[in-house]
Amino acid sequence: MLKYSISLILLSLLGFSAVAQNDSIASDSTRYAQKYGLRLGGDLSKIAKTVIDDDYTGFEINADYRFSKNLFIAGEIGTEEKTTSSTYLNATAKGSYFKGGIDYNMYKNWLNMENMIYAGFRVGASTFSQTINSYTIYTTNQNWPQATITDATKHSGLNAIWAELILGLKAELISNLYMGFNVQLKSRVTEKEPDNFENLFIPGFGRTYDSGRFGIGFGYNISYLVPIYKKNKKTPTEE
C-alpha cells in the first residue's frame, strides 16, 4: 500500500509542477535554457527493505547523463544479499550487479521544466554466490522419512545476464533535486547455476520464479542533478 501512495504523491507533484510552471511563463518567451549534466542518486526502496526485512540487505546507486533533449545515458550499480526458501530448499544469494542503457523522456516540459515520464532499456550483469543452507531429499517411499540436509554449501563464481524494459517518472521537487519511481520488466538471457540446484534469487534481477525467464521489479529513487552546461531551446511565442 505504501508504494502506491508514494506513486500517487509523485504523480501529483509532477502535475503541480507543470501548472505552476505554466503560470510563470511570460507570453513573449521565445527561448529557454535546458540543463545538461550528471544526475546521481540512490534507490530508497532497497534501503527501506534492508531495514524491515531480516532476510534482505541491498544498496543501489543510479546515474544518468543527458545526451540530447530527450535521450539520457543511464545506469545502476549495486549489491544484494537475499535468503530465499522454497519447499525443499533454503539458499542465500550474495553478489553485485551493473546495469547500463538509455532512457527516453516522453514528457513535453513547459520551458525550463526538467521533469520526466520515460521509457528505458537496460542490459544487466551480475556476479554472485549461492550458499545452500539446507535442502530436503524428496522420496516417494512412505517407509522412509524425507531427509533434510543442513550442512551449508557455498557455490561461488555464478553469473547472470538479462535485459530490462523500464517505465518511470522523475519529478523535480526543488531546484536540481528529483524524486521518482520506476517499474522494470526483466528477461534472463544466460545464467550459471549451482550443481543440481536452481538459483532462487539473482542480485540485480530478483526472484527467478521457478525457472521462468521473466521477472519484475520496481524502484523509488531520489537523485540530484549536477549541472555541467546549458543549451538554449527555442519555443514558439504564445499569442
Residue ranges of predicted features:
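Transmembrane beta-strands of outer-membrane beta-barrel pores
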Residues: L44-A48, I77-T83, Y104-M106, V123-S129, ...
